[in-house]
Amino acid sequence: MNVYLLLASGILCALMTVFWKYRRFQRNTGEMSSNSTALALVRPSSTGLINSNTDNNLSVYDLSRDILNNFPHSIAMQKRILVNLTTVENKLVELEHILVSKGFRSASAHRKST
């Protein structure tokens, strides 16, 4: 009987942990999506209908301006991202150079041995 009680309490604890983490994950993603207005690609018209003749789509300029107004720290973040991307690009070029040079060396060594 104690084994069944221990098993049931273990299952209950596991389910409570999963439920708690699931609720916390939903709350975090819900807050992000409700606060993020920069990803809205279509402006609602006054009638609620979208005409193809009217300009309801945000342009890149409007979207960039909206992002800068809502997230003033985004310029610094974009600069850091560009620096990181440049670093990654340089590392990939170095890796490609190393792999190509090793590939040629092993190919030339393989040809000499045969």
From Swiss-Prot:
InterPro entries: KKLCAg1 (IPR027940). Residues 1-4 are cytoplasmic. GO terms for cellular component: plasma membrane. It is a single-pass type II membrane protein. It holds the Pfam family KKLCAg1. The keyword Hydrolase does not apply. Glycans are attached at N84. The chain crosses the membrane at residues 5-22. Keywords: Cell membrane, Glycoprotein, Membrane, Signal-anchor, Transmembrane, Transmembrane helix. Residues 23-114 are extracellular. It is found in: Cell membrane. The keyword ATP-binding does not apply. This is Kita-kyushu lung cancer antigen 1 homolog.
